[in-house]
Amino acid sequence: MKLLDSVRYASFEPYLSIRTTHMAVIRYLVRDVDVAMEFYTNMLGFELVEKWGPPFAMVKRDDLTLWLSGPGSSAARPLTDGSKPAPGGWNRLVLETDSLVSLMERLSQSGAHFRSEVVSGPGGKQVLIDDPSGNPIELFEPSGR
């Protein structure tokens, strides 16, 4: 048991230097940083933190910082196996809302693409939308609101 514990702690050691003061950071690959910035700031309540030329911007909402990496950013470069990172997929960020219906109406009026109908469960109700580059966002209204 002692050897197993030392292996576990030894493998954790490199992670002790990870900065923990700001852990909620997500990077999304986007087709157009300006379009993505406008969507997240005007439609979902994020604020612009920084913009580094056309290929990169950071937006923030509460404790979440979202990195928007466009074509030409280092995150969009081909990987060593030749594959090229692209927007989309199913991993997603989840944004809580007090009124899913109101937010859906606003997004629908702006032409947002909904991936799903509203799904209800014991914890609340949710719907999936796409940002302008096809990255999924889950909008979630907890039960009891």
PLM features per residue range, with description:
Residues L29:
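Catalytic core of Fe(II)/2-oxoglutarate
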Residues L3-V25, E47-E96, M104-D130, E141-R145:
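Vicinal oxygen chelate
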Residues P136-L139:
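Short glycine-/small-residue motifs
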Residues A36, Y40-T41, L107, G134:
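Conserved active-site tyrosine of GNAT-family acetyltransferases
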